[in-house]
């Protein structure tokens, strides 16, 4: 269970990371929407797992490669934004959040019709 401090830091990081990725998408990936779907900080506040979703979905792999290569630059940009709220910036791990793709697949299956497996 997350502490109140973890929840506050998750929220702070998510808001600021969204701004960082908005600028990054405009500069490096025009026409691509990068969304910070969630951030989970460990109890010791040393590691933050950042879950990103991309639209269009076919640009996910290329964008994730770019983000992994430029992780120090992204962390530095984040540190500049939250330097007055956090003493130490957690290490950041990036993961592609495929929940949008999963939802799109479910929508497609429902639209196609077919037999309902739940009766």
Region spans (language model):
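Charge-rich, low-complexity N-terminal segments
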Residues: 1-47, 51-119
């Amino acid at each position: 269970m997350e502490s109140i401090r973890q929840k506050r830091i998750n929220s702070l990081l998510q808001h600021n990371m969204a701004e960082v990725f908005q600028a990054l998408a405009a500069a490096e990936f025009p026409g691509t929407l990068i969304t910070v779907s969630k951030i989970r900080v460990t109890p010791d506040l040393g590691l933050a797992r950042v879950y990103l979703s991309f639209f269009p979905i076919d640009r996910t792999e290329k964008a994730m490669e770019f983000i992994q290569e430029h992780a120090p630059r992204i962390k530095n940009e984040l540190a500049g934004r939250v330097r007055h709220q956090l003493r130490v910036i957690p290490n950041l791990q990036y993961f592609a959040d495929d929940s949008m793709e999963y939802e799109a697949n479910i929508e497609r299956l429902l639209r196609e019709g077919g037999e309902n497996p739940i009766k």
